[in-house]
A protein has these predicted regions:
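Conserved, mostly hydrophobic/aromatic
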Residues: 224, 290, 327, 342, ...
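N-terminal capping/small domains of soluble enzymes
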Residues: 56-241, 334
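Generic structural signal for well-ordered alpha-helices
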Residues: 263-275, 304-311, 339, 360, ...
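Short, surface-exposed connector motifs at secondary-structure boundaries
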Residues: 316-325, 340-349, 433-438
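Catalytic alpha/beta core domains of metabolic enzymes, predominantly
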Residues: 336, 348-500
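Active-site beta->alpha loop and helix N-cap motifs at the rims of alpha/beta catalytic domains
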Residues: 217-218, 227-334, 546, 556, ...
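C-terminal extensions of enzymes
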Residues: 2-6, 11-12, 16, 21, ...
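A solvent-exposed, charged loop/short amphipathic helix patch at secondary-structure junctions
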Residues: 238-253, 391-412, 529-537
Length: 582
């Protein structure tokens, strides 16, 4: 039995050992304020034939016992019913209740879900008549939470927008939230995935607000030092006490050690949210991507040691379960050595700081040979497009003599990451790689708006033109822009469509793009256009040159700077705690 098979067996065993929870226990959890735990039990671990009856019974119990409940219990039950109604109309039932692999008799129908949501809404309206104080408390909390999320989505005046979304009562909140979920283009991609029409999964490119992203169908999370820090800033009431506890438990620890522990806590919180999806899919999805210390980008042994230590810690925190985590490694020679070591042990990785085919081809082969259940190869599309754009703008006068204006070059640059992703997908399919296990992942998405980009198919080609790839990880503001577009006719296999020839005619003037796009292997790509050959093709063995290549250099520098800032924030918190104690 291979390592991968043993890992999958452990996941199956954990799911099989999940205890069956009765109605009384679920009501007890509600009384204790644990309504998310109740929701997860119902939606992910209750067998479909029992689901409707159990939900009806819980609503009946709430209605009968509500008048005699404590005030905290009443508020919790109203909150539960509201979230229950939203979950019913979200993507979440697709993971288990609407599972297309089941026959009609063992699945819940959309009609049944709609009926349950309607019943929950009626019950809320009835109970809320004599609980106006609880309604006010809940809507105030929702406005605060949603305002934080909308701020991350770069919405102007997020407090005002949150107030409009929540409305004056729970009924308005349910109506508006449901409409928002149903109109989401990102949700549309997830729905295609649920139907088996596209392999593309959507991911939350953020270490916060995963609960909302999961309503839209997110099944993956990508984290790096800036994103972990952002999660802390987004919810200081939650994470300040956690950081303080970590500092107090080990006051003499180095800043680096404390940064690792804080990262671990934020990652673990996201892992727990995705854990049911991970179990239900036998480890095929439901992962959190955790970046090792970016300062070790050229030290394979340090990266491996850090990953193994964290993996072991997470295993313990999960009670011996297989951690639903993949480790971000840089697409460098040292990263390749670390990749082979970790995946040989069955530990999944996400190859990051990736921009070019000379990186992707090597790592795809290594991951195919590895033992991990799932690994990903990230193409950082926007972080490639901007250096390409800047390079072309630097020669705009020369290009003008060839009839290429600024609008054409800006538009072409926006295609550069898309072009690399399409080529990567093409070559991996041509080689017969297992694309369910070795997944191309598109990250660093950009929104292109204004007159220079009117010729693009959409303002977000990094999404619309690569559907059909393994994973698309979406930053909140990009998802907001994508969802703000009119309902789209999504193409399930858009990644297979070629890049327009006129775009490549412009991009051949960029050395940065040619370095990224060029394969240089006649066996892999005999039809390759020699006009797209860079002056000095890179390979991973040229580690010093790779680290100096503009997109790699810029990204590693930013990650290291962000990691330093993260450590500084922790040090500031340590100093503050010391002053408070003194």
């Amino acid at each position: 039995m291979t390592k991968r098979e043993r890992l999958k067996n452990r996941i199956r065993e954990e799911l099989a050992q999940h205890p069956k929870i009765d109605r009384g226990t679920l009501m007890g959890w509600l009384a204790q304020g644990e309504y998310r735990r109740v929701l997860e039990e119902l939606f992910f671990f209750t067998e479909s034939p029992e689901f409707v009856h159990l939900c009806q019974g819980i609503m009946q119990d709430i209605e009968m016992s509500f008048p005699s409940m404590r005030e905290s219990g009443q508020e919790c039950c109203l909150g539960f019913l509201a979230e229950f109604s939203i979950w019913l109309q979200s993507y979440l039932p697709n993971w288990h209740l609407l599972n297309g692999d089941k026959d009609a008799l063992s699945s819940v129908s959309e009609r049944q879900l709609t009926a349950l949501a309607a019943r929950a809404a009626l019950l809320i309206a009835k109970l809320a008549q004599d609980a106006t104080g609880h309604v006010g408390s809940l809507t105030a909390r929702w406005r605060k939470d949603i305002a934080s999320r909308l701020a991350a989505e770069s919405v102007p005046n997020p407090q005002q927008a949150a107030a409009a979304l929540v409305g004056e009562d729970i009924g308005s909140y349910l109506t508006n939230m449901t409409a928002s979920l149903r109109s989401s283009n990102a949700r549309g991609i997830a729905d295609l995935h649920a139907k088996g029409a596209t392999p593309t999964e959507i991911s939350n490119d953020y270490a916060a607000f995963l609960d909302y992203a999961m309503l839209l169908g997110a099944s993956f999370v990508t984290c790096n030092p800036p994103l972990v820090d952002i999660a802390w800033v987004a919810d200081p009431e939650r994470w300040n006490p956690v950081v303080d506890r970590i500092v107090q438990e080990d006051p003499g620890a180095s800043s680096e050690a404390l940064a690792t522990k804080v990262t671990l806590e934020i990652v673990l919180a996201n892992m727990r949210l995705l854990r049911p999806v991970f179990l239900l899919t036998e480890g095929c999805t439901g992962y959190v991507s955790l970046q090792v210390n970016p300062r070790n980008h050229d030290n394979s042994s340090a990266m491996v040691s850090e990953a193994i230590t964290i993996y072991s810690d997470l295993e313990k925190k999960l009670g011996g379960g297989v951690p639903n985590v993949v480790f971000k490694l840089p697409a460098t020679h040292a990263g390749l050595v670390a990749c082979r070591d970790l995946t040989g042990q069955g530990i999944g990785v996400n190859i990051t700081v990736g921009f070019g085919m000379f990186q992707h081809v090597e790592f795809a082969q290594a991951l195919q040979e590895g033992e991990a259940i799932v690994s990903t190869i990230t193409n950082m599309s926007g972080r490639l497009a901007f250096p390409v754009r800047d390079e072309l703008l630097g020669i705009v006068g020369r290009l003008a003599k060839s009839g290429i204006g600024e609008v054409e070059l800006r538009e072409a640059a926006a295609w550069s990451g898309v072009a690399v992703v399409k080529r990567l997908h093409q070559l991996m399919a041509r080689r017969g790689y297992d694309l369910g296990r070795v997944k191309p992942l598109v990250a660093s998405l950009r929104v292109y708006e204004g007159g220079a980009y009117e010729g693009l198919p959409t303002p977000v080609p990094d999404i619309s033109e690569v559907i059909g790839v393994g994973v698309i990880t979406i930053f909140p503001n990009v998802r907001r822009a994508f969802d703000a577009l009119p309902p789209m006719k999504l193409r399930p296999h858009a990644v297979e469509s070629p890049v327009p020839k006129n775009v490549l005619d412009v991009l051949r003037h960029s050395e940065v793009f040619k370095q990224a796009f060029y394969v240089g292997d006649p066996e892999l790509l005999p039809e390759e256009d020699d006009q797209l050959r860079p002056d000095h093709p890179l390979c991973l063995d040229d580690e010093a040159d790779v680290l100096e290549w503009t997109p790699v250099r810029n990204t590693i520098a930013e990650f290291c700077k962000s990691y330093d800032a993260f450590e500084t924030r922790i040090e500031d918190r340590r100093q503050l705690a010391g002053r408070v104690v003194a």
